[in-house]
Amino acid sequence: MAANISIPEFYNGQSIFLTGGTGFIGKVLVEKLLRSCPGIENVYMLCRSKKGKNINERFEEITSSPVFNLLREQNPQALNKIILIEGDIAMLEMGISKTDQEILKDKVTIVMHSAATVSFTEPLKVAVNTNLRSVRELICLAKDMKNLQSFVHISTAFANWFELNVKEEVYPSIYDPDDIIELANRLPDETLNKITPIFLGKHVNTYTFTKSLAENLVKREKNLPTIIIKPSMVGASVSEPHVGWIDSLMGPARYIYYTTQGIFRSVYLPNRSAAIDFVPVDFTTNLTIAAPWKCEIDKRTNSSMTYPYIYFSATGSVNQLLWKDYFKNSRDFGRTIPPKNAIWYPQIRLHKTKIGHHIDVALTHFIPAYLNDLVAKIKGQKAIFDE
């Protein structure tokens, strides 16, 4: 392979196996791959039945999303390159049939593992099976792929958030990932939930705990061409597939949405100079696509490469946005271009003390919400904030 080959040229004839293709990052990743790398052979996308819809119904729903509008305009036939693989990452062997496993082993050249549960309150067993065991199952499958060039695992920049200066490396865990997987699936749920805080240690939730362990799983596979992508909080796009595109109220988008609506009015922010670290989704997906290209070029020029390649997709100390400015900008945006369903005039107060914040929440969140729902019930209307 020539050292000056372009990224689209690199993807000519490649077959991708993608997990998490139905999620926020996954949809943008699929769209970008099919639109910018038209020579791709196929994208095998893991998908499960959900909420009474089978995988084909979910596929129709997902591909009708506005995220694919530009692709449909430029190259509508590209969507035919998506081949659904029924499965569930939380299951053993990811719930993939033996027949489909053989297809993947024979055809796939690049694995992109984006699927995860990003809930901070997930029980340990659920988080382990979804974020950790799935990586082990996928690695086992990837080892038998005849033409594998890259194994890309999307982790998080916060996997070891408690380290003072986080470097592009995998930090060793005091636990063996296999032991945690066995323990989580052997102990009764009640017992496991009681001892979860002991295992978490410095980790504040099961999300970062399992993500850190998953990185250790990837690192130990010395003979696999592994890549770890570590995004911080992922927000709306800068330009692709559309300016400001987002379809999820996770992370930073949630704060913007509720602040502009006038619902979110008080924030506990003891450190006014604290920076918020989040990146546009198209930055993260572009990095995910470019990383296998870089890995393959390096393999051609360096016979002593060490894996995994690790890339952060984060702001860090460059072009920082402070939390205080983030909330004020959201407030000002809501005042300038108010949403149609705004509840109240946008206002936000930043508190250095918890007591001040709690008082403000009671006065501007709970009491108004209760009165609003009370009036709605009297009128025979549906309460909005009851939940």
Short names for language-model regions:
Residues 193-203, 226, 231-240, 244-291, ...:
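A conserved pocket-lining segment of Rossmann-fold NAD(P)-dependent short-chain dehydrogenase/reductase
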Residues 105, 110-114, 121-129, 133-209, ...:
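Conserved Rossmann-fold NAD(P)-dependent oxidoreductase catalytic core, especially the SDR/UDP-sugar
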Residues 130, 276-279, 321:
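Residue-level signal for the nucleotide or nucleotide-sugar donor/cofactor binding architecture
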Residues 1-117, 124-125, 136, 145-150, ...:
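N-terminal Rossmann/SDR dinucleotide-binding element
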Residues 36-40, 141-149, 221-225, 294-304, ...:
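Secondary-structure transition/capping motifs at alpha-helix termini
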Residues 291-387:
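Mid/C-terminal beta-alpha module of Rossmann-like enzyme folds, strongest
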Residues 60-75, 166-197, 345-350, 365-381:
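Alpha-helical "lid/cap" subdomains adjacent to substrate-binding clefts that gate access
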